[in-house]
UniProtKB/Swiss-Prot annotation:
Superkingdom of this protein's organism: Archaea
Enzyme class: oxidoreductase
Record domain KARI C-terminal knotted: where: 182-327
Coiled-coil regions, chain positions: none
An MF annotation (GO) of this entry: NADP binding
Protein name (record): Ketol-acid reductoisomerase (NADP(+))
EC number of the protein: 1.1.1.86
Listed cofactors: Mg(2+)
Amino acid sequence: MIKKYYESDADLAAVQGKQIAVIGYGSQGRGQALNLRDSGLSVIIGLRPGRSFQQASEDGFEVFPVADAVKKADIIQILLPDESQGAVYKTEIRPYLADKKCLMFSHGFNIHYGQIVPPPNVDVVMVAPKGPGHMVRRTFEEGKGVPALIAIEQDYTGDAQAIALGYAKGIGATRAVVFETTFREETETDLFGEQAVLCGGVTSLIKAGFETLVDAGYAPEMAYLEVLHEMKLIVDMIYEGGFTNMRDSISNTALYGDLTRGPRVIGEDSRIAMEEILEEIQNGEFAREWMLENIVNRPVFTALKRNDEEHLLEEVGAEIRGLMPQFKKNA
């Protein structure tokens, strides 16, 4: 069974008196930094010039160039995009990693795939909230927390686990639960979840359902409402109580269709495709492909993203959301 930690298992003392540098100030960086500060910890921000620099300053943080922040810090939490971390680490972090510093991540991609290879005389840990930065912040302000993962890749000082748990407590994660994992397990399961289910799987399923109805002559608006708009209602019920809760809340007609037709949509061919996707993650093929895509300025990424943004589904969705007061700001 996976090991779990709660408030009583973590001690802020492990990170008190240490200078924490959060490198990056996007959604996750901002949420974590604000929570850490509100927990009484010393936090500075390391950034390259840009809009985030102004935001961090307005939030009351001392903001430094990345290299200067690393020099000042005992704990360096790297919260930059995966594709940017390697280059920034090489030029602005690695030269200033002094003995016994702690290098921290919220995703294992760069460590697991060797884009970042830390020296042996530092701790290397992960604290990965299982929610976006704004949720990390909001739940903290409500006196609750978002669950998180911790992993220890390198324990040079002997204090790596205590530091990871102390940091997790500082962002509010131990108010919920903290699970212990490894960099490998977190990276591979996270990528698989994104690609096969949460992002790639869901969007492809919705798009295929929408196109099937429209191609059969049904109004695009009806297709949108049936395959996308109602998705949140179903997902919320699953989130709150699993499949059983959702199935107890729908009609018997819907449930019979679920049980008898669902496996025809996601059947053996889909399972085979999922296994292939997982293998590409495990053997590093996906990581190499994504790194190469960035080296050549993302031509495939840009084209595919543009195609989906111009899809009829997006046009109809914007129109329908514009008719609903609660969605107008997102239309």
